[in-house]
From Swiss-Prot:
Binding annotation for Zn(2+): 903, 906, 923, 926
Record-given protein name: Isoleucine--tRNA ligase
Lineage: Bacteria, Pseudomonadati, Pseudomonadota, Gammaproteobacteria, Alteromonadales
Any one GO molecular-function label of the UniProt entry: tRNA binding
Residues involved in ATP binding: 608
Span of the annotated motif 'HIGH' region: 58-68
Domain of life, per lineage: Bacteria
Residues annotated to bind L-isoleucyl-5'-AMP: 564
Catalytic activity reported: tRNA(Ile) + L-isoleucine + ATP = L-isoleucyl-tRNA(Ile) + AMP + diphosphate
């Protein structure tokens, strides 16, 4: 016999080397849908302990971006890993469907409501637009391999959800948290509506910074406070502001009670002035005003000046000095211009002193007709006119352009204003909501843990929540208010339930179609319907009640986990906490996990103008969703998540390592029947027992990492195992035994059994992350099995057997180190062209006594571990000058080219080649494997 190829156990599998993910994944998705994969997962977990991850709804507008992909993939990894852990983990995706962005898109198509179309028609167009956006985003999310109830998602515009949002508000009202008030709120003049804190972004803006003098009404009274009887100069106090347009609404001058204020006399352009400013800011003020000389006439605490009155710089009334904790001496003058209608601090201190809440500005940002000097002017355009009038009146001491951070509308990207308007608020303090929320924050696990202090500070400092909006497309605030007293109808909660019942049937339009008499009867004339809509953050913030409590899949279980981007501490996490605590006295979640934003390779935000946007569909169409999923899993999401073409290329390289490992396992399971061929772990060859033990230990680490949501550790450990323990060591060593041993021998079946156990475990390890590839591997594994890996639990066949005391974990770890040193020495000999490959090498190991004793345990099988044809061990003292030093103490190596003949079948060079006459080209080991009982392997 001259061709021995047929006697070898060559690897064979239909599992392809190339993933071709971009082409293969859509076919798999189609199969998953046709075979009702998600429903089968649900059925497989009937009666299991629930794990509820509640989906924070993305906004139903536009294509998904890379941040959406990160979020959905992280959620999918968790859902799948929890399912593998035996939990019943449903995933119901949701969408946020009301609000301004959709209104603006619809306005562009059909015009504003009440002009070309009725409000009812406009709402219907908004509903249709949102539905189309949901359809588009749904397909994109499905393409990422995210499993969920995609055909039955929750939409905040679903009639039943809209009704439940109304019911949620009724509970908040019933618990005493709602109040109506005229308060300054963030107001976008382009939207014509109030904005929530979460709808405000801060951008740099150039504003006029001005110092304005308010002249004393009773100069003698002011001087007396400083112990003076008279002064040649006119006495004034000075404010510094970057919002000149708010001066028409000025009603007070705030000072700090415990700060020293100086009365400073100075000369400028030949005339004297006397001004009151904070002592710490005198030098900077005098420099700013370009004064020639100055002197301090006296000093008092701010408290001493309380209720002294000063003339408004251009109106015919005067305003008082008031004392406030918000005043600092960081900049300006230490005296704060106070307009209660245009600022939160101003409003609070104004309430304390009973100041008028003046609001001369209309919804559109234009001064009202009765505003002297500025009627009909837009506030930002009026700034220059205010400055000019101040100069004309002699009240302007300084005017410069000032660059600073300023609030902008998140949608229009335009500067916003604070403006006092009648609005509905959820009070933070009238029923202890702030205190209770802070208590609930402490009971919640925040991942990363800095999330706790972040949201605590926000809750501690946040104002009452303005929940009303003056918009068309939103859930209505379904209240009846008395026309004379402005009081809520005494049966408001019961009435809201009746309205909710109608909305359940007809949607939110039912409120606007409702004739008050239908519910109020003869009282109808005494009440008016509220026409405001709810802040969309209320919509999404109440979904723990409107969706989770209502969907049968959740069976009334509380939510375990909320997972969103780090901006949601002030958004969805906050609104959900406020509403849940107001309704039920507790947080809606047990754990809150946040991930960072995606940035490019240079740490910059994704921007179309920069041209660094990476669209998820471009990645899936080019590389495949599994590559994107691997990048997400491998990135530490606790900080910024860097992504670029180069980084994705590295993810593709890592993927190939995992895929090639899986393919090697599958190819070498050719002909293996798990039922009949499996070797018990205790009967395996020592090396196989060790690798099974390593896999069992790794599985424990991987499961712990999944449990802690440390997916980057999962990928690190998996890559380490594939590259080092398997790729560079175990799989390399077993090739000889796998290919050349007798087909049904214990030596080969032991190896295959270990490979099978590893493959069964690994396919589950990768399933939450590389979902498409895991399904592909699953279909290629030998033995009867259920249809999908996603209905399985973690593999229990990996038993952490106790190794022989002589062949411990430390023994094998040390052996890997020795092998690495041998490989280096052989590679050096190959570069020097002394050997062609490792099987041409004879290696002499010069070792100290301890290492000699250790290596000798393997006997002749040491050569299989080192991949050499012959290996001999000699005392370290015998090493000659030609022996190579290694990095391992007590080890030197000598590599020589073997003189022995090469076996045609196993390619080992052995002295016994040709000893069997019938097989002159084979070594005796190969003859035994062909014609005899097969070689016996004990160790490797």
């Amino acid at each position: 016999m001259s061709d021995y190829k047929s006697t070898l156990n060559l690897p064979e599998t239909e599992f392809p080397m190339r993933g071709n993910l971009a082409q293969r994944e859509p076919e798999m998705l189609k199969s998953w849908t046709e075979k009702k994969l998600y429903q089968k997962i649900r059925e497989s977990r009937t009666g299991a302990k629930p794990f509820i991850l509640h989906d924070g709804p993305p906004y139903a507008n536009g294509s998904i971006h890379i941040g959406h992909s990160v979020n959905k993939i992280l959620k999918d990894i968790i859902i799948k890993s929890k399912t593998l852990s035996g939990f019943d983990a449903p995933y119901i995706p949701g969408w946020d469907c009301h609000g301004l962005p959709i209104e603006l898109k619809v306005e562009q198509k059909v015009g504003k409501p009440g002009q070309k179309v009725s409000a009812a028609e406009f709402r219907q167009k908004c509903r249709e637009y949102a539905a189309a956006q949901v359809d588009g985003q749904r397909e994109d999310f499905i393409r990422l391999g995210v499993l969920g109830d995609w055909q039955n998602p929750y939409l905040t515009m679903n009639f039943d959800t809209e009704a439940n949002i109304v019911r949620s508000l009724a509970k908040v009202i019933d618990n005493g948290h709602l109040h109506k008030g005229v308060k300054p709120v963030h107001w976008c003049t382009d939207c014509g509506s109030a904005l929530a804190e979460a709808e405000v972004e801060y951008e740099d803006k150039t504003s006029p910074a001005i110092d304005v003098a308010f002249v004393a009404v009773d100069q003698a009274a002011v001087l007396a406070k400083f112990g003076l009887e008279q002064s040649d100069a006119e006495v004034a106090t000075v404010i510094w502001t970057t919002t000149p347009w708010t001066l028409p609404a000025n009603r007070g001058l705030s000072m700090a009670g415990d700060i020293d204020y100086d009365l400073v006399e100075f000369t400028k352009d030949g005339s004297k002035r006397a001004i009151i400013v904070a002592q710490e800011l005198v030098e900077s003020c005098i420099e700013r005003y370009g004064a020639e000389l100055h002197s301090v006439l006296g000093t008092v605490k701010g408290q001493a000046l309380e209720l002294l009155r000063f003339k408004h710089p251009f109106y015919d009334f005067d305003v008082p000095v008031i004392i406030g904790d918000h005043v600092t001496v960081d900049s300006g003058t230490g005296v704060v211009h106070t307009a209660p209608g245009h600022g939160q601090d101003d409003f609070v201190i104004g309430q304390k002193y009973g100041l008028e809440v003046a609001n001369p500005v209309g919804d559109n940002g234009v001064y009202k007709p009765d505003t002297e000097f500025f009627a009909g002017q837009h506030v930002f355009k009026a700034n220059d006119n205010v400055v000019a009038l101040l100069e004309e009146k002699g009240a302007l001491l300084n005017h410069v352009a000032y660059r600073h951070s300023y609030p902008h509308c998140w949608r229009h990207k335009t500067p916003i204003i604070f403006r006092a308007t009648p609005q509905w608020f959820i009070s933070m303090d009238q029923k202890g909501l702030r205190t209770q929320s802070l208590s609930e924050i402490e009971k919640t696990q925040w991942i990363p843990d800095w999330g706790q202090s972040r949201i605590e500070k926000m809750v501690e400092n946040r104002p009452d929540w303005c929940i009303s909006r003056q918009r068309t497309w939103g859930v209505p605030i379904t209240l009846f208010v008395h026309r004379d007293t402005e009081e809520l109808h005494p049966d408001s909660v019961a009435l809201m339930e009746r309205v909710a019942h109608r909305i359940e049937q007809e949607g939110i339009q039912a409120w606007w179609d409702l004739d008050a008499a239908e519910l109020l009867g003869e009282e109808a004339d005494q009440y008016r319907k509220v026409t405001d809509t709810l802040d969309v953050w209320y919509d999404s913030g109440s979904t723990f009640s409107s969706v989770v409590a209502a969907r049968p899949e959740y069976n009334g279980h509380p939510v375990d986990l909320y997972l969103e981007g780090s901006d949601q501490h002030r958004g969805w996490f906050m609104s959900s906490l406020m509403i849940s605590t107001a309704m039920n006295g507790k947080a809606p979640y047990k754990q809150v996990l946040t991930h960072g934003f995606t940035v490019d390779g240079q740490g910059r935000k994704m921007s179309k103008s920069i041209g660094n946007v990476i669209a998820p569909l471009q990645v899936t169409n080019k590389l495949g969703a599994d590559i994107l999923r691997l990048w997400v899993a491998a990135t530490d999401y606790s900080g910024e998540m860097t992504v670029s073409d180069e980084i994705l290329k590295r993810s593709a390289d890592a993927y190939r390592r995992i895929r090639n490992t899986a393919r090697f396992l599958l190819a070498n399971l050719n002909g293996f029947d798990p039922v009949n061929d499996t070797v018990a772990i205790e009967d395996m060859v020592a090396l196989d027992r060790w690798v099974v033990r390593r896999a069992a230990a790794l599985q424990a680490e991987i499961l712990e990492a999944y449990e802690q949501y440390n997916f980057h550790l999962v990928t690190q450990k998996l890559m380490q195992f594939c590259s080092v323990e398997l790729g560079s060591f175990y799989l390399d060593i077993i090739k000889d035994r796998q290919y050349t041993a007798k087909r049904d021998s214990l030596a080969r079946r032991s190896c295959q059994s270990a490979l099978f156990l590893i493959a069964e475990a690994m396919v589950r390890w990768i399933a939450p992350i590389l979902s498409f590839t895991a399904d592909e591997v699953w279909q290629s594994l030998p033995g009867e099995r259920e249809e999908f890996v996603f209905t399985q639990t973690w593999f229990e066949g990996l038993v952490s057997v106790t190794l022989d005391s002589d062949l411990s974990d430390d023994y094998w770890a040390n052996l890997i180190t020795v092998r690495d040193e041998v490989n280096k020495a052989i590679e050096q000999a190959r570069r020097e062209q002394r050997v062609g490959g490792s099987l041409e090498a004879e290696v002499t190991i010069y070792a100290d006594e301890a290492l000699t004793e250790s290596l000798a345990l393997l006997g002749d099988e040491l050569r299989f571990v080192l991949l050499t044809s012959n290996t001999q061990i000699a005392p370290l003292a015998n090493a000659g000058d030609d022996a190579v030093e290694t990095e391992l103490a007590g080890l030197k190596l000598l590599v020589d080219k073997t003189e022995a003949a090469k076996c045609d079948r196993c390619w080992h060079h052995r002295e016994d080649v040709g000893q069997v006459e019938a097989h002159p080209l084979l070594c005796t080991r190969c003859v035994t494997n062909i014609e005899g009982d097969g070689e016996v392997r004990q160790f490797a």
